[in-house]
């Protein structure tokens, strides 16, 4: 069975065609600048040259038409006919409170997605456009939506309700939702498998540390808390996002410094975090290099990030009344020996003991804790596309 996984952004589209018999990606591609000058598609597949197309694409339907063409291209394609695509899985950022798991695309589901669009105005509209484009081009192929928020719907009220008037939650659905759920779900299942344990017997802290970053507390296979909130802005210090901040800073920026609400939104989402504090970059490698050369701001930025991760690890150990394993995943979590080392330093009193030699690895499933460490430490590469494909197979097979 072949599943096409699609992740639509406002002017971009990522895709993978996955053979679910082997769970290998037959092709991986990216379409950029949809609706803009210089629109292009790049596709990679094993044993074939990289395929690049520069061609005008007025909308996502044009983009998906090109994707389908690339997949069956005589020279660069990986399948002979579109009939070999058995299902399509769409990443959707926000499923609101209604969806605690993935769902088959129906008229009712599409209406719900439209309603959730106000909760994720930067993402859900693009996701919806992608689904409609696929429906127009491949009307007979079953489609599934996989939500970033779904995995976190098991959180209890004490974790997701904000201490605002309760009617704002009841009427306006203002609450913590959490994001990166597909990644947290994937790596928590993978670590249970790697340890040879039943996930229902484990207390797991998953650290998805990339340009966007979040941590989840997973007890007996269910998420009980996570760092991102009503939007992906809450929680950790991130590449360009500020993370937790006194909400009164927002009103101060508007009332005293003359910012508009949109300017504050842009400031906190795109100009803050590691990038804003360091003044260098949102790329940890660049900021680490600047800190090594004596940049005070770069060092402060790194310290803020590391401290925010440490604080949540401590909090989640308390919240779950213990922890069996901490998992590092995503770009920084999988690849940064420096950041993992700095985060785990001085946590021995909690039973967290990093092995410096074992930590000298990148992007593979590996234990990095010392023998005898009470809380195990692991690196587990995430694979959100495979998780989406697995959910898609599970739903269409029902």
Curated annotation (Swiss-Prot):
Q: Kindly state which reaction or reactions the protein catalyses.
A: acetate + ATP = acetyl phosphate + ADP
Q: Where are the transmembrane segments?
A: none
* One example GO MF annotation: acetate kinase activity
Gene that encodes the chain: ackA2
Give the record's cofactor note, including how many are bound.
Mg(2+). Can also accept Mn(2+).
Quote the InterPro entries the UniProt record gives. Ac/propionate_kinase (IPR004372), Aliphatic_acid_kin_short-chain (IPR000890), Aliphatic_acid_kinase_CS (IPR023865), ATPase_NBD (IPR043129)
What does this protein need as cofactor? Mg(2+); Mn(2+)
Supply the name of the protein.
Acetate kinase 2
Q: Which residues bind ATP?
A: 14, 208-212, 283-285, 331-335
